[in-house]
UniProtKB/Swiss-Prot annotation:
It is a multi-pass membrane protein. Keywords: Cell inner membrane, Cell membrane, Ion channel, Ion transport, Membrane, Metal-binding, Sodium, Transmembrane, Transmembrane helix, Transport. This is Fluoride-specific ion channel FluC. GO terms for molecular function: fluoride channel activity; metal ion binding. Fluoride-specific ion channel. Important for reducing fluoride concentration in the cell, thus reducing its toxicity. Pfam families: CRCB (PF02537). GO terms for cellular component: plasma membrane.
Amino acid sequence: MLLPILAICMGASVGALARWGLALWFGAGGFMPWGTLAANLVGGYLVGVAIASFHLLPDLDPAWRLALVTGFLGGLTTFSSFSAEVVTMLLEGRPGVALLTAAAHLGGSLFLTWLGIRSVQALAA
């Protein structure tokens, strides 16, 4: 029971630091919170890569899956920040930007998850 907990904690720590790094790199303010969008889009792509890779590696230790998906990608991506940012835009009277931000996160993440799966499938073919 200790190994899964450690795997998740280690992955989550690295993912959260990566998200923080993206927020610093993209900076605050501007048209839309680009760091949060980048974290969610990168996470969407990487979860697709992980899904397809795990399919090709059925004997992979479950601790790796926990570390990568539950831990790292759980720490990297952020639904709570996304929600807070969109609601703040609505409260500030910027419904168009709020809608665009929500569409970019949702549509972009779904597309990149699909692209991640297709990327691994193409490389494995």
